[in-house]
Amino acid sequence: MKKILVLFALLMTGVMGIHAQEGLKWGAMAGVNSSKFSTDGFDSKVGFHVGIKAEKDLPQIAQGVYLDMAALLSLKGTQINGNDASLKFNPYYLEIPIHMGYKYAINDNFAIFGNFGPYFAVGLFGKMKATGYLIDEVEGLTSIHDSAKVFGSNAMKRFDFGLGLKAGVEFFQKYQVSIGYDWGLLDNIEDSGNKNRNLMLSVGYFF
C-alpha cells in the first residue's frame, strides 16, 4: 500500500509540473464502478475509482477539442452467486485512460462534453473470495470461507487494455459529473474469453 501511495504522489507531482509548464487544467475525480466479466454467468459487482485527472485544450485541431487523461485506482471485478456458494473477484488496478474529447459551452457556467479513447491498466493487488456450504453426512452443514490472490499464473492477468466512452456536464468550469463505460479488449484470464466490462459514475473537481 505504501508503494501505491508513493506512485500516486509521483503521478500527481508530474501532472502538476506539466500544468505549470503548459497550462494544463488538472484536478481530482472519484466515483462508483459497476463491473463484471463479459461472458454469461457473471453478475455485476460494485466497486470504486479515485485519482487525478487532467485536460489539455487542443485549439490547433478545433475549438472545443481537448485531451482527457487520468491516473486512477480502480476496483473492478465480478461475482458468481449460486444457491449454496458465491465467488467474488476483487482486482485493484492502476488505470490510465487517454481520451480525445469535445466540450460545448452552453454559457460561461455550464458545458456538456463527451470523450472516447483507450485505457491501459495494471493489476496491483486483490483477492478472490469464495463462500459457501457443504453438506456432510456426519457433520451436517459446514461453512466454507476461502481466499486467494486475484492476480497470478492460475488467476487473472495483470495487464488490461480497452476502449472507454464518457459523457457528462461541467459547472462553473470546475465541477464535472459524468457517466462512462469501458470495454476490455484482452482476456483477463488465460484463454477464458472473459473481458472486463465497467460502468462508471464519476464526479470531478478542477483546482
Regions found by a protein language model. Name each.
Residues 4-14:
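Sec-dependent N-terminal signal peptides
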Residues 20-57, 111, 132-134, 204-207:
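Short glycine/proline- and aromatic-enriched beta-strand/turn motifs that initiate or cap beta-hairpins
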Residues 28-30, 67-71, 98, 114-116, ...:
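Membrane-embedded beta-strand positions of outer-membrane beta-barrel proteins
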Residues 32-36, 56, 73-77, 104, ...:
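Transmembrane beta-strands of outer-membrane beta-barrel pores
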Residues 37-43, 76-92, 123-160, 164:
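Extracellular/periplasm-exposed beta-strand and loop segments of Gram-negative cell-envelope proteins
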Residues 53-57, 99-103, 166-170, 204-206:
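Transmembrane beta-barrel domains of outer membrane proteins
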Residues 59-65, 110, 173-179:
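Repeated loop/turn-to-beta-strand initiation elements of outer-membrane beta-barrel proteins
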Residues 195-207:
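Outer-membrane beta-barrel "beta-signal"
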